[in-house]
Amino acid sequence: MKAILQRVTDAKVEVDSKTVGEIGTGFLILLGVENGDTEKEADALAAKIAGLRIFTDENDKMNLALADVNGSVLVISNFTLCADCSHGRRPNFMAAARPDTADPLYEYFCKKIHDNGIERVEKGIFGADMKVSLVNDGPVTIEINTKDLKI
């Protein structure tokens, strides 16, 4: 499971010109579910993200977690994070989990973010063509791959 985390001051996602998710201060998370991912990876990733201290404190040090700043999360499913660009010019997406596996894990991940103390979790619509806009704060952008976590 892969996540791209962006610290934002505002973010929203639209489907068919209608806003389906919107947050203020928090994280915009692009989530890619790979073949072989399970709830174990979702649990570990949600816990890692909820506890990640990348908001600045009064001394301008990255020392505060999402809950410390009363932040929210906007989670967007994004199979393109699973792209393999090692051959040719067209990405290969064979590492991405099939929708019948990825969608339930996406929903489970969103629930686990909430279970880890994040009150407001907004979502895009799995599999939809979405328009995502954000105001990046910093910018702070972090990539997390559960294959790199000790779980």
What are these regions, as identified by a protein language model?
Residues 45, 76, 140:
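Residue-level signal for inorganic ion chemistry
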Residues 94-96, 137-151:
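Short, low-complexity, polybasic intrinsically disordered segments
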Residues 11:
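RNA/tRNA-interacting regions in translation and RNA-turnover enzymes
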Residues 18-70, 81-95, 99-111, 116, ...:
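Compact, glycine-rich, soluble single-domain proteins
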